[in-house]
Structures are given as C-alpha cells and as structure tokens.
Amino acid sequence: MTKITGIIAEFNPFHKGHEYLLNQIDGLKIVAMSGNWMQRGEPAIFDKWTRAEMALSCGADLVVELPVMVSVQAADFFASGAVDILKNLGITDLAFGSESAIDYNEIADIYETKETEMESFIKALPDQLSYPEKTQMMWQHFTGIKFDGNTPNHVLALAYAKAAAGKNINLQAIKRVGKFHSTKLTEGFASATALRQQLFSLTDEVGQSLFSLTDLSAIENHVPSVILETYASPKTNWAAYFPLLQYKIRLDDHLENIFQVNQELSVRLKNAIKSAKNFDELVELVYTKRYTKARVRRLLTYILLNIPKEFNLPKEIHILGFSKAGQEILAQNRGKIISKIGQKPWDELTQKADEIYQLGNVDFKEQNFGRKPIIKREK
C-alpha cells in the first residue's frame, strides 16, 4: 500500500521550517492549504496560488484548497474540516509539527473511546470560559496533558488527533525546531510571524511593495533559495481592508445575522468602531476573557466577508497544483475534484471571499475563474 501523507498548512508564508517538515515525510505528500483567509482571522500575505507554488517547489506533490469556512475556524473545526478532505483523498498518514513529544495516536484512541464523555465534560463547563480554555481543561482531565500557554502547535496537534480519531489515520508528529512564533528574525528557522513583520517593514500602509528583488537579503537565510524570488509577489494585510470593515460595521444594522455574531458582540463592535484607528486597535477594544483575540479576529473576518449563519461546505475538492506523482492521486479521485472554476462553480462563499481579497492589492490576479492548477516542472 502506497504511503500517502497529508499535511494541513497555511504557509503564510512558506519558510525553511515548512521545508524541513516536508523533508521529514516519506511517500506522497498532499497539502490541504488554507486559501486566501487564515485560521486566526487574517488575509494571507501572498495569495493562494503563490503559496501553492512555493509548496510544490519545496516537495509537495498535491496542494488542495481548504474552503474559507474550514480555514477561518477555531482549531477543532479547522482540523475536522481539513482532515475530512484529506481522508477523502485517501491519506494513510497525517504529519504535523508539534512542540510536544507525546504519542498523538494514543490521544486519538482515547478520544475515540471516550468521545461522548469528553464532549459532555466540555458542555458542563461554565459559559464564561472561552472555548480554548474548555478544550484544554478537557484534555487535562482525560489525558493528564499539561499546557504551559506557549504551545500553539501542540493545541492544534490535539485538534488533529481528535479529528483523526476512528479514521484509521496514522499520526506523525514532527518535533518543531526553532522559535516558530517569535516575532524576530534570528539564527536558524524563523517563524512565519517574523517573516511577515519583516516583509511589511518594507511595504507601505496598505501592503504595496517598496522593495525590489535585491532587497530580499534580510530574509534570504530563512527562506528556501528556490522560492526566494517568489517573495517579491504582491502582498496584503489587514490595513488594506480596514476601511471596508469600518464601512460594513458602521452601516450594517443587523450584524447579528453574521456567523457567530450575537447581540452583545454587535453592540461592542458598533461602539468600538467609533474610535478604533486600525484593525489591531479594534480587536483590543472588543476582546474579553470569553471572546479571545483570535475569535474576535475571525468574527471581524466573517463580517468583512458577509458570512451568513447557515452555510454548506462544498462536496468537491479544489486543486491548486500538483506534481507528476500528485497527478496519480488525482487519477484515483476523479469525481471528487474540481480543477478549474468557470462554467462549473465550486464554493460560493470562498469565491466571494476571494473577490474581497483581491481588493487588498491592485496587483493581485483573478483568483478563481479561468485559473488552472499549477503543474510542477520536474527536473
């Protein structure tokens, strides 16, 4: 049986740590990658096609897109949607980075055995606790796992274990190397956060590039050389969309019709938008112990993208790119995939979200209609 390993990723942006992860994996590698909107509620620095090209250049065999309402979700829902897509494509293994050395297969077995009891435990916890707090308390109670507050990939890995429970998927945790959430460029593997900060120190307030290829020397030690030039591609960040968000919040009298926005949050948002000067300031004004900053960023993304309370996820899987080996996987999954969005639509919410994303930089190309999967050139 051919080993097919799934990787769930954002690659925002792709760096040497991601290359290291791919190099640790044997067999065929399928990446389920967030599109143009990220799990923690922010636009991707580079568009989905640019990031898919980076992944293919550095070892991925097939890159498929996570629909926007899988990618912009809390960890459990993000993991569940992504694992379902990868399982549908026939993965045997799921690889991910983690700060912990625990056996995640054992964790998946515990959840499979005690799912009902564990979910009931969460529901019985006080409402004033945030969902991440409840989830961590559940894991601590049933497995004895301890959290030190600085293990974001460990938390996500537990969500993968939960999503993979009972699906006959082998979990392969790869030890993280370097400071993956540091905001500074240091020796060794730099974090995506540090790279984004460095890139936007070289751009104007709406993300328009102020540098040429010759100015990429500040990051060249942290990026695979084969994709360094790709870093000169058009970029964006929340600064480009904040005026649109201000307009939406100020004029929409029914924000509670947006996904996960309740009356309390609607009032908080209406009040906060009067004084917030930028996106980060708005998040600071709205968040509470119960409504974490990550949750508020996602809510603001839902508002910008006009996500309704009820929606359906697409059945087909959108292909962003593939290698020769990846083409074999596609051949085995005809009927499940969509390779070109045009006469046949894919996911209305994702396609509309991409239209809004394009407003973030005048140099962004059309994101869906007429775009064909990237085919990796074999050496």
Curated annotation (Swiss-Prot):
Q: Give the protein family.
A: Belongs to the TmcAL family.
Task: Supply the SUPFAM superfamilies for this chain.
Answer: Nucleotidylyl transferase (SSF52374)
Matches recorded under HAMAP family: TmcAL (MF_01539)
Per the record, the domain of life is Bacteria
Protein name as it appears in the record: tRNA(Met) cytidine acetate ligase
Which keywords has UniProt assigned to this entry? ATP-binding, Cytoplasm, Ligase, Nucleotide-binding, RNA-binding, tRNA processing, tRNA-binding
Reactions this protein catalyses: cytidine(34) in elongator tRNA(Met) + acetate + ATP = N(4)-acetylcytidine(34) in elongator tRNA(Met) + AMP + diphosphate
- Source gene? tmcAL
What's this chain's function? Answer: Catalyzes the formation of N(4)-acetylcytidine (ac(4)C) at the wobble position of elongator tRNA(Met), using acetate and ATP as substrates. First activates an acetate ion to form acetyladenylate (Ac-AMP) and then transfers the acetyl group to tRNA to form ac(4)C34.
Q: What is its EC number?
A: 6.3.4.-
Q: Any idea where this protein resides?
A: Cytoplasm
InterPro entries hit by this protein: Rossmann-like_a/b/a_fold, tRNA(Met)_cyd_acetate_ligase
